[in-house]
Amino acid sequence: MSRLPSGGRIDRTHPLRFHFNRTPYDAYHGDTLASALLANDVRVVAQSVTYGRPRGVFSAGVEEPNALVHVGHETMLRATQVELVDGLDAVGLNGRGRLSAEPDTGRCDKVYAHCEVLVIGGGRAGITAALEASQSGDRVIVADEQAELGGRLLGAAWTDWLETSLAALRSRPDVRLLTRATAFGHYDQNLVLIAQRRAGGGRLWQVRAKRVVIATGAHERPLIFANNDHPGIMLAGAARTYINRYGVAPGKRAVIFTNNDSTDPVADDLKRAGLTVEAVIDVRSGEAVVDTIPSPLAGEGQGGGCLGAVVIAQLIGKGPRRELECDLLCVSGGFNPTLHLFSQAQGRLRYDEGLACFIPDVAPTNVDVVGAAAGDLGGRGQGSIMPYWVVPSDGREWSTHFVDLERDVTVADVRRAP
């Protein structure tokens, strides 16, 4: 078991029982399927769609490309988004999956709502915007895709400000907080469509807002190197989330591979959770992880292609390579602001060389972007960053450098594209 003896936001007084690939496991209320599998040392969750390579949990949120599962009649669900309930029965998705021929028995409804301010995103920036807007008595709606408001703060070691702020919002009668609510459409005159997940069926919110605040945060980017898809490789921020939010140690011996400063607190949290941090490999120091070696262990979950070691080399010159044994590789290549809704609303973007990402440039009328979505990545701790996208390997062989883990797209595929 990789469950930490204390910590996390899970309810340890409320144990749950679930099945994955016909094997029973134990978990707690507040777990996702992904966190519960990691807690039970299940590392291989599925196989890749084209090559059938073993894949494990890579992230902790909606951006998960690997851990795709079937639950009941629903397929292509991300284990990081599946909230665990007692008796849940899930199967890892191997290949492309198949839609169920059974009719959907869920009952869905729709709600029309109006407000002065709609805040999309319930992280620190979104909660701050909602607090400011609600002070004047405006009707405020906050929508967030997660089961809890808090965003990245849920994966941090401190949450005092979050609890105090949420209590203040809940005490204000004109504030409505929507969880499990994904904004997926931003149309003319600030009409926003929101899909809310509920037991027994979904709900479609059609919200007309005088002003929309986009506080959708940013997604962490990976770094691309040979065999960067082994189970045991995950985003650095995800490792921190599993420790602090779910009380799970995602490994025992960790290596961190980065090009920015956001991994400093990750290393601290890994050590505090009892993991050994074997090394921090920073491309700004002239080193990189150039390849990975699978574990010699066999068997689904415990081994079967899981990470066993990393190969480290100098970026310039031909110095000696070295191998480090590890079962967890935390990667961070910087952050991309989440600007899909901003672009759909006809907002204009520009590329920021210093941040190595696109950020908002010209916003539509009555639309504001705040926090990490606006390029304010100080809260992510990114600090200085050395843009670095692909680590070359000997002979420039690109067929195992995965760009799109979900669809098995490699650097070789991109180079062949017209």
Each model region followed by its residue ranges:
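Residues forming the flavin
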Residues: 1-418
